[in-house]
Amino acid sequence: MGPVVERPAEPGTSSAAELELLKRRAAERIDEAAERLGALSRAIWSAPELAYEEHRAHGELTRFFECEPPAASWAVQPHFGLPTAFRAEWAPPESAAGPRALQVAFLCEYDALPALGHACGHNLIAEVGVAAALGLRAALESIAAPPPVKVIVLGTPAEEDGGGKIDLIEAGAFENLDVVFMAHPSQENAAYLPDVAEHDVTVKYYGKASHAAAYPWEGVNALDAAVLAYTNLSVLRQQMKPTWRVHGIIKNGGVKPNIIPSYSELVYYFRAPSMKELQVLTKKAEDCFRAAALATGCTVDIESEAHDYYNVIPNKTLCSAYTENGKKLGMEFISEDAVLNGPSGSTDFGNVSFVVPGIHPYFYIGTDALNHTEQYTEAAGSQAAQLYTLRTAKALAMTALDVIFKPALLEGVRKEFKCKLQEEQLLNTAA
């Protein structure tokens, strides 16, 4: 994956006072649409769908843009690259938008978790993306001669499993985008968190069934291999870096106690701060899996998922602009020390951050409940979350306006993106 082709960093200019008026108009438009936006979020929340199966959410989101007045003002492409992805685009008719137009994109997620529903608040991610796009459009519409800009919303399914954004990158959906924005619900406000790289595997052991009481010596125990593998990885933790994470389950351990299991299956996730470190960790783990097969006489298949999630490359220039706008709206952000020493996860936005500069902040939704719990599911569907969600959308829209009307900021965003991408490439190719 390579970076996008850039256009000149001069889409528009505006005085500080004029820019503040545009930001105010963006916030006003989001408030005006609050009821519709909340209804959209609740519709997605009330009918949770798993990765690549978000058909109802896809329909709700595309209909929202198709029905946004005036009629047909958004160019909507359903099933964009994936059955449950979409693209909505708007450009000021007076701006002579063309190939040189600055393309600003807001990303929506809307897949849920098995059994828990929207325990990661992806309904709120979708709402933030839609709301920010509406706010930015309203601000640009208030200008007599708006600059050449395209406002794009990308519906990106399957973040929880599979990596829909990676599919869309491969399909060309991120080509020619200049800056991308999205925001993720959490327990605090942070312009970024150190999201790490992730590699997932399914490990299958094949043995030989036998009667466990009458002639166990005739069997080859695949469950023993799974247990040994689990133990091997537990011992490996002594030599793991503090920033590495390994977690897994035994998905299949046999069918009946008096039958020597002929098959077992584990699923493991490996995480590390960089793709380079992730490769080292993965090699160590695979050695553990193969050693368990050797010790038990089983055969083993190690199947990697189709996509690895890259670590997120933060753009501090963009983060600073977002933080400034957020503080004006009353957001309180955690400290840099808390960011660096706090919890982290993985996201397919990491892969996006290697292709186009962007921002992936986290936002408080009025609860201390942790993501991926029943309590967070409840909070993500609550009315209390709406204030914080729409406030975040306003901050994103305001930051997008900064990018559009401050050429020096856009140039800084691009320069930092290039430098950090080169650093990552050097890190990942170093011996």
From Swiss-Prot:
It catalyses: beta-alanyl-L-lysine + H2O = beta-alanine + L-lysine; beta-alanyl-L-arginine + H2O = beta-alanine + L-arginine; beta-alanyl-L-ornithine + H2O = beta-alanine + L-ornithine; N(2)-(4-aminobutanoyl)-L-lysine + H2O = 4-aminobutanoate + L-lysine. The keyword Protease applies. SUPFAM superfamilies: Bacterial exopeptidase dimerisation domain, Zn-dependent exopeptidases. Keywords: Carboxypeptidase, Hydrolase, Protease. GO terms for molecular function: carboxypeptidase activity; dipeptidase activity; identical protein binding. One of its GO terms (biological process) is regulation of protein metabolic process. InterPro entries: Amidohydrolase, Bact_exopeptidase_dim_dom, Peptidase_M20, Peptidase_M20/M20A_hydrolases, Peptidase_M20_dimer, Xaa-Arg_dipeptidase. GO terms for cellular component: nucleoplasm. It is an enzyme of class 3 (hydrolase). The keyword Protein transport does not apply. Its EC number is 3.4.13.4. Belongs to the peptidase M20A family. Catalyzes the peptide bond hydrolysis in dipeptides having basic amino acids lysine, ornithine or arginine at C-terminus. Postulated to function in a metabolite repair mechanism by eliminating alternate dipeptide by-products formed during carnosine synthesis. This is Xaa-Arg dipeptidase. The lineage of its organism: Eukaryota, Metazoa, Chordata, Craniata, Vertebrata.
